C-alpha cells in the first residue's frame, strides 16, 4: 500500500499512520520497539502509565548515558512520544471498529521513519538568531484480530 513500509497487509487488519509529527525520533524508535507484539488494550494501558511516569520504556537503542531503571535496565519516560503513540493507537482502534473487527486486536507491524526537516531558530546574544534543523517523524501501525495467522 502506498505510504506504508509493509508490503502486504494481513487478512482482517486495520492500519493508521501519523505523518510529520514533532517528537524525538530516538524516543519514538524505542517506544515502537516496546509496543510491538502487544495487544491493543494493554498497549494503551502501558502508554497511560508511561505518560504518568509510572512505567519506564526500556531502551534498546540510542542509550548512551541512559539511566538504569529497576527491573528493566536502561530506560526513560518519553511522555511526548507516548502521547503521540496513544493517539495513533486510538486512530487504529477507530479504523478497526469501522471495518467491523473484534475488540481483541494485536499489533503486528509498527514502524517509525524520518519525515522532512524544518528550520527553526533560537535567540542568541546581541539580537542575533541561530538556525537549527529539526527532524519530523512518521509513525505507522497495523493491527489484526488475535488468533489469526
Swiss-Prot record:
GO MF term list: rRNA binding; structural constituent of ribosome
Biological process according to GO: cytoplasmic translation
SUPFAM superfamilies: Ribosomal protein L22 (SSF54843)
Top-level taxon: Archaea
Alphabetical UniProt keywords: Ribonucleoprotein, Ribosomal protein, RNA-binding, rRNA-binding
Entry GO terms, CC: cytosolic large ribosomal subunit
Family per similarity comment: Belongs to the universal ribosomal protein uL22 family.
Function, as annotated: This protein binds specifically to 23S rRNA. It makes multiple contacts with different domains of the 23S rRNA in the assembled 50S subunit and ribosome.
Subunit comment: Part of the 50S ribosomal subunit.
Protein name (database record): Large ribosomal subunit protein uL22
Name of the coding gene: rpl22
Amino acid at each position: 500500500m502506498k505510504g506504508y513500509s509493509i508490503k502486504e497487509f494481513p487478512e482482517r487488519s486495520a492500519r493508521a499512520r501519523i505523518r510529520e509529527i514533532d517528537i524525538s525520533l530516538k524516543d519514538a524508535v524505542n517506544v515502537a520497539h516496546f509496543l510491538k507484539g502487544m495487544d491493543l488494550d494493554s498497549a494503551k494501558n502501558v502508554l497511560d502509565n508511561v505518560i504518568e511516569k509510572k512505567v519506564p520504556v526500556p531502551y534498546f537503542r540510542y542509550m548512551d548515558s541512559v539511566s538504569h531503571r529497576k527491573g528493566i535496565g536502561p530506560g526513560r519516560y518519553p511522555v511526548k512520544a507516548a502521547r503521540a503513540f496513544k493517539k495513533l493507537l486510538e486512530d487504529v482502534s477507530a479504523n478497526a471498529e469501522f471495518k467491523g473487527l473484534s475488540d481483541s486486536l494485536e499489533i503486528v507491524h509498527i514502524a517509525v521513519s524520518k519525515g522532512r526537516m524544518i528550520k527553526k531558530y533560537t535567540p542568541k546574544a546581541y539580537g542575533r538568531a541561530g538556525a537549527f534543523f529539526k527532524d519530523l517523524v512518521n509513525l505507522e501501525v497495523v493491527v489484526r484480530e488475535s488468533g489469526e495467522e
